[in-house]
């Protein structure tokens, strides 16, 4: 780099507002202040007062024999590849639902029936469960389905809540690592929205690893919730992280990082800011209906 180029770099104005590094520094100071306040506040509790408060809180979470929890919570099992159902407020584990794993107790992943459900991904013996979400009608849980994604092998599975078992599974094509899954809320869960996290070359056949190439990108994915088939995919720059849909049925939005299309952490953190990508669902549907799309050989 010559002196002229160095001068140009030095003269680039800082973006307005609080920078990422400034925010982290401010957060550290704020955290120290809050910690101090908590310590001061904690000093007013005697041991007896604290014990009484803890006992009262415990009594509100106790669910006795023959009693039912008020709510059921659905947790992802992470690298276990399963979904776990827990009672709330008791926090007792009630059931484990095998999804992306092999389960000897039930035969999941071993029986012909379960292999038919798993389809072309039945040979995988592992999964990385993320983001379980319940289907909705008019913005409220309808108790019909639960959907969950597998980051390890780019899959999305559906669990029927009337039987608490996985009944459909889809391998998302043209992508690497499905991460970030949400559902259309209004008027009902027509689509399952799933981010593909990593930028990859297309076709991803090993002929190139150039992420700066125009044919290197990631995809925002919409899955037909009833058929469990791909509805559409949208080409996006940068790695997609998390996603969500609004309460009007019009928009979905995804957070993005690595707008630099870098390979390492330092490169991915180079830009001060990345972006949020907003998708207009009706316009996407209209474009597909008008034939304004391409087909990828995934």
Predicted regions and their residues:
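Predominantly soluble domains enriched in secretory-pathway, periplasmic, or organellar proteins
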Residues: 17-18, 27-36, 48-298
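Hydrophobic alpha-helical membrane-insertion segments, chiefly the h-region
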Residues: 36-43
